[in-house]
């Protein structure tokens, strides 16, 4: 949000008061609109600061960025102001990113931790035998489902 960090702290407290759970993730303030403009969350002509702007003026696209340990953006989810974020989906994606960064796998649609993943098509069957000695279920040559430990 383009609000200052102090405003976010108040919002976080409100969330805790209402739900019993406080957000536990980093939040930044962007009162100079630098980040919001850089990532196209506000129009380029939005001015130079959030000061003097109305709440409607400061209504950024609500965007979730997942940044990897390599400091590269791994996921961008954009939500309109009228729609709350789906934290189950955000956590599911983080689980998938962590799994697929460690193993030569991809996760299918609606995958959840504990479910089968897909061996990357770039992995030969010979290499897959070494990587996944438990075997796999090949629906197609490029679609090899494997139990994930």
Language model features with spans:
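Chalcogenol-based redox active-site neighborhoods
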Residues: 1-149
